[in-house]
């Protein structure tokens, strides 16, 4: 079997797809408006209580609605945690390189908080480049979440790191945490090196 380098491919932009599907997200409502709606519908009241909790959410008015705190590459065979702090200096993060051994199975875990209002259609998008050429684009639907003091955690399905001599090397990733309303909650860049071994 011959080894092949990752090939660049073109995917339709999410905005173009939304246009073709004629999808329009529902208008944004404040948390207070949502809590006041359909008060006499018992099943909806229970659902909202499950989503929002019992009491009023006290939020810092200066905080963004969504705060992405960290990204972790979850890999059982890794010698230690592979975690990036997304609350600090994102420019410094661009200069760091994280290592994955070729062919290992891993998942991406994202920790985030919703601070004020319900957010609909959260998604994690990752563009991957090698020597300046886009070689992959992945979009993961994260879902809709209500505000709460605790962090939420999202795990992608299991993926396999590229393998083979031609696949080894450094990949530059541009990651986006966005939603149906096209709010850019966080955009960051980071590097991933695929190596023959963890300690190579």
Swiss-Prot record:
<dbReference type="GO" id="GO:0031267">
    <property type="term" value="F:small GTPase binding"/>
</dbReference>
<dbReference type="InterPro" id="IPR024792">
    <property type="entry name" value="RhoGDI_dom_sf"/>
</dbReference>
<dbReference type="GO" id="GO:0005096">
    <property type="term" value="F:GTPase activator activity"/>
</dbReference>
<dbReference type="GO" id="GO:0016020">
    <property type="term" value="C:membrane"/>
</dbReference>
<dbReference type="InterPro" id="IPR014756">
    <property type="entry name" value="Ig_E-set"/>
</dbReference>
<feature type="modified residue" description="N6-acetyllysine">
    <location>
        <position position="20"/>
    </location>
</feature>
<keyword id="KW-0963">Cytoplasm</keyword>
<feature type="modified residue" description="N-acetylthreonine">
    <location>
        <position position="2"/>
    </location>
</feature>
<feature type="compositionally biased region" description="Basic and acidic residues">
    <location>
        <begin position="30"/>
        <end position="40"/>
    </location>
</feature>
<comment type="similarity">
    <text>Belongs to the Rho GDI family.</text>
</comment>
<comment type="function">
    <text>Regulates the GDP/GTP exchange reaction of the Rho proteins by inhibiting the dissociation of GDP from them, and the subsequent binding of GTP to them. Regulates reorganization of the actin cytoskeleton mediated by Rho family members.</text>
</comment>
<feature type="modified residue" description="Phosphotyrosine">
    <location>
        <position position="23"/>
    </location>
</feature>
<dbReference type="GO" id="GO:0005829">
    <property type="term" value="C:cytosol"/>
</dbReference>
<feature type="modified residue" description="N6-acetyllysine">
    <location>
        <position position="39"/>
    </location>
</feature>
<dbReference type="GO" id="GO:0005094">
    <property type="term" value="F:Rho GDP-dissociation inhibitor activity"/>
</dbReference>
<dbReference type="Pfam" id="PF02115">
    <property type="entry name" value="Rho_GDI"/>
</dbReference>
<protein>
    <recommendedName>
        <fullName>Rho GDP-dissociation inhibitor 2</fullName>
    </recommendedName>
</protein>
<keyword id="KW-0007">Acetylation</keyword>
<dbReference type="GO" id="GO:0035023">
    <property type="term" value="P:regulation of Rho protein signal transduction"/>
</dbReference>
<feature type="modified residue" description="N6-acetyllysine">
    <location>
        <position position="174"/>
    </location>
</feature>
<dbReference type="GO" id="GO:0007266">
    <property type="term" value="P:Rho protein signal transduction"/>
</dbReference>
<keyword id="KW-0597">Phosphoprotein</keyword>
<feature type="modified residue" description="Phosphoserine">
    <location>
        <position position="144"/>
    </location>
</feature>
<dbReference type="InterPro" id="IPR000406">
    <property type="entry name" value="Rho_GDI"/>
</dbReference>
<feature type="modified residue" description="N6-acetyllysine">
    <location>
        <position position="101"/>
    </location>
</feature>
<feature type="modified residue" description="N6-acetyllysine">
    <location>
        <position position="46"/>
    </location>
</feature>
<comment type="subunit">
    <text>Interacts with RHOA. Interacts with RAC1. Interacts with RAC2. Interacts with CDC42.</text>
</comment>
<feature type="region of interest" description="Disordered">
    <location>
        <begin position="1"/>
        <end position="40"/>
    </location>
</feature>
<feature type="modified residue" description="N6-acetyllysine">
    <location>
        <position position="123"/>
    </location>
</feature>
<keyword id="KW-0343">GTPase activation</keyword>
<feature type="modified residue" description="N6-acetyllysine">
    <location>
        <position position="24"/>
    </location>
</feature>
């Amino acid at each position: 079997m011959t080894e092949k380098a990752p090939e660049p491919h073109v995917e339709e932009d999410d905005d173009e797809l939304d246009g073709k599907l004629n999808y329009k997200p529902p208008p944004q409502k404040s948390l207070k408006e949502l809590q006041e709606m359909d008060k006499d519908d018992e099943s909806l009241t229970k659902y909202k209580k499950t989503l929002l909790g019992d009491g009023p959410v006290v939020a810092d008015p200066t905080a963004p609605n969504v705060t992405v705190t960290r990204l972790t590459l979850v890999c059982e065979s890794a010698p230690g945690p592979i975690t990036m702090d997304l609350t600090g200096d994102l420019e410094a993060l661009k200069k760091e390189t994280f290592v994955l051994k070729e062919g290992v199975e891993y998942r991406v875990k994202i920790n985030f908080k919703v601070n004020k209002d319900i957010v609909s259609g959260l998604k994690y998008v990752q563009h991957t480049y090698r020597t300046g050429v886009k070689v992959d684009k992945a979009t993961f639907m994260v879902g809709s979440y209500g505000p709460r003091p605790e962090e939420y955690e999202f795990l992608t399905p299991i993926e396999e790191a590229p393998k083979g001599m031609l696949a080894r090397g450094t990949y530059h990733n541009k990651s986006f945490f966005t939603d149906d309303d096209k709010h850019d909650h966080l955009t960051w860049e980071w590097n991933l090196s695929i190596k023959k071994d963890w300690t190579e």
